[in-house]
């Protein structure tokens, strides 16, 4: 089977969880099916308007696909920003369309108390309505979609990485630290984490906080760290490759992901897979695999004092931490093993292809 895959970022150069997810998924599926990935060639910052970037990106993807001169059996689109190309190519090539909804911009903006971009609302609806089958990574995401779409939704989580290679920790990192990583955007909840850490450090005086990633909120977080007198206790690192992330995970006291909106939680999955004591927020895709006091720690980061108390108690209880770390690792292998994920995708692709009236 030949799959035409559309994505806003290339799996070989991931810049977010979507790219990391694709990188892993394609590596597991490639021995069994042929996947050709098409991505935009332009850069968002070079466009005056977001709509112009999306329009040009989709036009470019369509042009590249049509000039590729290869027969495909199915289109798999990732993210609503590929919706115009996906919908057009479905009609032009007469192919069934599967779409993975990695998150909803409408829900993300609601959490941040901002108005979603009208163009994104349109592309979300276009992709959901055009797809013959929808894939989401968590039951949380399934609940987020309209009930009318539920009949064509399949929940398939992101596969575990199964990678163990680590590097050597820099001498400057030879200290006790909490670790969090991802995009520096409001919905990741890092402003709340800084507030919690400001309290926690008073009880854990040798503890540091390491934040790795990139995004528009970086300067805001740096100012917050200074306001809470944390400049010498918080270290900001750039976007890291997976090997460096595993290295830091292997040396941290715990990994903390306080997101206010999280469709799946790939970083938390990665942390648990590495056997790290993992703290997540109460909502989102975390809930499919993070069970409080069993496989992970679930905290309400809006209650700053209570969250600090909770983290402090687990940092001091080594035996309980050891039990949770091992259970978390086993949970990820049980629910997200690549064999399970690969089988689910192959079966879904086959079903979509066989059910299509146009193949």
UniProtKB/Swiss-Prot annotation:
EC number: 2.4.-.-
UniProt record similarity statement: Belongs to the glycosyltransferase group 1 family. Glycosyltransferase 4 subfamily.
Keyword presence, Glycosyltransferase: yes
Pfam families for the chain: Glyco_transf_4, Glycos_transf_1
Record flagged with keyword Transferase: yes
One BP term from GO: biosynthetic process
The protein's name in its UniProt record: Uncharacterized glycosyltransferase YqgM
Molecular function terms, GO-annotated: glycosyltransferase activity
Keywords of the record: Glycosyltransferase, Transferase
Enzyme class: transferase
């Amino acid at each position: 089977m030949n799959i035409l895959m559309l994505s806003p970022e290339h799996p070989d150069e991931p810049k977010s969880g979507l790219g990391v997810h694709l990188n892993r998924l394609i590596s597991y599926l490639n021995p069994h099916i042929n996947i050709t990935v098409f991505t935009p060639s332009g850069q968002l910052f070079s466009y005056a308007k977001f709509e112009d970037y999306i329009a040009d990106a989709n036009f470019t993807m369509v042009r590249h696909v049509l000039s590729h001169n290869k027969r495909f059996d199915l289109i798999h689109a990732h993210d609503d920003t590929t919706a115009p190309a996906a919908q057009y190519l479905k009609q032009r090539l007469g192919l069934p369309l599967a779409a993975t909804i990695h998150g909803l911009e409408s829900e993300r903006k609601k959490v941040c108390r901002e108005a979603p971009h009208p163009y994104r609302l349109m592309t979300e609806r276009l992709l959901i309505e055009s797809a013959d089958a929808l894939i989401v990574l968590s039951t949380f995401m399934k609940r987020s979609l309209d009930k009318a779409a539920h009949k064509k939704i399949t929940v398939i989580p992101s596969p575990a990485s199964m990678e163990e290679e680590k590097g050597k920790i820099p001498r400057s990192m030879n200290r006790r630290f909490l670790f969090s990583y991802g995009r520096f955007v409001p919905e990741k909840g890092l402003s709340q984490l800084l507030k919690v850490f400001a309290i926690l450090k008073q009880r854990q005086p040798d503890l540091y906080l390491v934040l790795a990633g990139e995004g528009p909120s970086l300067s805001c977080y740096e100012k917050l760290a200074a306001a809470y007198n944390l400049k010498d206790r918080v270290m900001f690192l750039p976007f890291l490759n997976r090997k460096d992330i595993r290295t830091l995970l292997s040396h941290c006291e715990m990994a903390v992901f306080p997101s206010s909106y999280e469709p799946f939680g790939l970083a938390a999955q990665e942390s648990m897979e590495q056997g790290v004591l993992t703290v997540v927020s109460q909502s989102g895709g975390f809930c499919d695999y993070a069970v409080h006091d069993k496989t992970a720690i679930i905290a309400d980061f809006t209650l700053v004092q209570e969250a600090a108390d909770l983290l402090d108690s687990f940092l001091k209880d080594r035996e309980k931490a050891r039990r949770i770390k091992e259970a978390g690792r086993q949970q990820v292998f049980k629910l997200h093993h690549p064999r399970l994920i690969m089988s689910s995708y192959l079966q879904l692709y086959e079903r979509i292809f066989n059910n299509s009236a146009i193949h």
